Amino acid sequence: MGLVLFGDVVGSRRDSVGSTAWLRELVAELDSAYGSERLAPFGFTQGDELQGLLAPEADPLTAVLHAALGSAGRRMRWVFVRGEIDEDSTGNAPATERTGSAFVVARDAIEDARTGRERLVILTGRPGVDSLLADLAPALVDMLDGLTDRQRLVARLAMLEDLRQSEVADRLHVRRATISVSFNRARVRPLQRLVAGIRLVYSSGSVDPGRAATEATTATEPEPIVAGQADGGVQQ
């Protein structure tokens, strides 16, 4: 099992050289951000399509946020698919050379996303979870697209470096009141809540349905009554 990701720069043909340079920087950033969760090095194709292969429990939004909140952030189209992957006989093949059913699904999904002008598709293999993620994804894309350069910087410090408002103010050498205004304009708090919600929904897709049903049944079963306690007392 693995988490396959495909991403391409929206409108990359208008600046293919710039898009390629930016993707190269993003690949290095994501390799570092995911660390041991990578099952293969990130890479990108000549068509400016980024590909990655991560552990199934990895957080897809890490890639989305790193791309969207960078200083030269470009609009991306993302597809994430959790599913089966083939073994790597070499042990060091990059994601662009890996195969498996999850890659096939991801290829079809990103083509559909281009046709439907979708920007973020996350597929866990559980229809109920995937449907809810499809409802939430456009809201995240809209919020990220609406940020100015300054707001992206503030959001990046808060969401990727986990800094408090006071720490962001210190980092940027501005008054805390100024950062408070920036937080409000960037809608950092609502953005954090939305990201947390999507992460929660996504993580629910990793729970085995059979195991979840068993745990739910166990949790709702009444506790057995110990002999002598039926009337609220204990026999001596």
Could you tell me what each predicted segment is?
Residues M1-A216, T220-Q236:
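Regulatory and interdomain segments flanking nucleotide-handling catalytic cores
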